[in-house]
Amino acid sequence: MAKKTKRRGIFLSPAIAAVLAVALIGVSFGAGWFFGVRSTQFHGDILLVNESHRLSAEYVPDDLVNLYTQRHSFRMASSEIYLTRQTYEAMEKMFHAAEEADMNGYIVTSGYRSYQRQQEVYAESEPGKAQQPGASEHQTGMAFDVTVETNEGFESTPQYGWLMTHAHEYGFIQRYPANKADVTGISYEPWHYRYVGVDAATRMHRTGQTLEEFLGQ
């Protein structure tokens, strides 16, 4: 009688199996999704998004509101601009205060942008002019771009000066300040503001830190 040979299988622990699964997914979508790129993380209640902390293609905030349908103390470049409700409410308070201080004319030009829309923006932009899909803060619904009607740069206007002095009081930071591109990976954008909450924004305003520096990233 022939001797039966025992077959030995390879058993992996659930943790190792999960790591291998992520690695295979990363390879199938491109090495950048696994090697050298960390997943986006919450630091407390602050969401960090940049080239090293990306959002998935499926990520969509669950509380987006259309600014056009809400009470607003600002103008809009489009009737299809969305932000999370918390971000909108803080922004409305901020621009209402600006209006009471005779700082008028703010125009919100951009808010939430889906992963798929960011793919289009990235493909249509010159190299270095737009973030890669998943690396844009606009996908969080907590960032917006703003300007005013001017023949000068926004950073030369009184409205910009008011924001630089008061934005933190409403939970906003200028996300990509001048002379910090080596930290943020993004050149100066005086028009781009991000909601992080009053406490964090105030602390960053006092120290001059970027979000990466504040979070130790």
Segment roles from a protein language model:
Residues 2-111, 115-217:
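Extracytoplasmic cell-surface/polysaccharide-interacting catalytic and binding patches
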